[in-house]
């Protein structure tokens, strides 16, 4: 807890160096009207709708296995107990931290649109592989790698949505992006009966396969906006 608190304090202190911006003119509008306008704006732009759809998919089909279902996996699959659960959670989030540091260092010339697609596809593939794993050591390695790849999906995804939005719409667009988390409780709600009915391994295979196919469909359907190297979404990512 002390380390987490220290990170929050450090983040706050670093935020003090962010350049200020002149206040925008006040605009009186109903919050629901703003939300509807944001959804309509995202719906009209493939370079926003694609990332939003992918964000919803990873919440629906990928995050459940490293969040709500991880205690089940630790107990029923790895027979690891409380300590094993801690190791599993730490493996994923340590990988995510390492990936975030690599992305944030801006040492790699990432094409953000392509990066979020290929890393999303690898992430869903890792869900399938994790479901087939019954060895704790291999599970830890897979979770670390998954967390690492996860950062190459989520961070560029946010960059694409910010870059593709007009300045006056960025706040509302990112608000819509946050609503993608609604996929997580839905994914968890569906996973319970599926695991009871068809088993854990089949459920991970189903979730991972659906996510992988949907990611490929996003990349193909909106390839001009997200995959082509000339697309604005693939301008050099500066971290």
Task: Tell me what each language-model feature is.
Residues 11, 18-19:
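Conserved beta/loop motifs at nucleotide-recognition and modification sites
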Residues 1-9, 13, 36, 43, ...:
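C-terminal transmembrane bundle of multi-pass solute transporters/carriers
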Residues 28, 60, 180-181:
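A generic secondary-structure micro-motif detector
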Residues 20-53, 237-239:
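Juxtamembrane intracellular "pre-TM" segments in multi-pass secondary transporters
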């Amino acid at each position: 807890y002390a380390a987490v608190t220290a990170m929050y304090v450090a983040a706050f202190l670093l935020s003090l160096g962010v350049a200020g911006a002149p206040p925008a003119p006040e605009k009186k509008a109903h919050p629901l009207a703003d939300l509807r306008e944001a959804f309509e704006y995202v719906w009209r732009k493939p370079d926003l709708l694609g990332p939003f759809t992918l964000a919803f998919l990873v919440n629906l089909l990928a995050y459940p296995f490293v969040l709500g279902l991880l205690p089940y996996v630790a107990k029923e699959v790895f027979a690891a107990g409380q300590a094993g659960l801690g190791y599993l959670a730490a493996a994923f989030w340590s990988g995510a931290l390492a990936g975030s540091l690599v992305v944030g260092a801006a040492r790699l010339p990432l094409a953000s649109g392509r990066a979020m697609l290929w890393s999303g596809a690898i992430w869903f593939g890792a869900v399938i592989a994790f479901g087939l794993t019954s060895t704790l050591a291999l599970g830890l390695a897979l979770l670390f790698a998954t967390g690492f790849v996860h950062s190459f999906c989520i961070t560029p995804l946010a960059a694409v949505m910010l870059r593709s939005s007009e300045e006056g719409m960025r706040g509302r667009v990112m608000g819509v992006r946050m609503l993608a988390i609604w996929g997580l409780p839905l994914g968890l709600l569906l996973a319970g009966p599926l695991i009871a009915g068809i088993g854990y391994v089949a459920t991970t295979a189903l979730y991972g396969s659906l996510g992988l196919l949907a990611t490929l469909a996003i990349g193909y359907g909106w390839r001009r906006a997200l995959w082509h190297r000339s697309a604005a979404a693939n301008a050099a990512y500066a971290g």
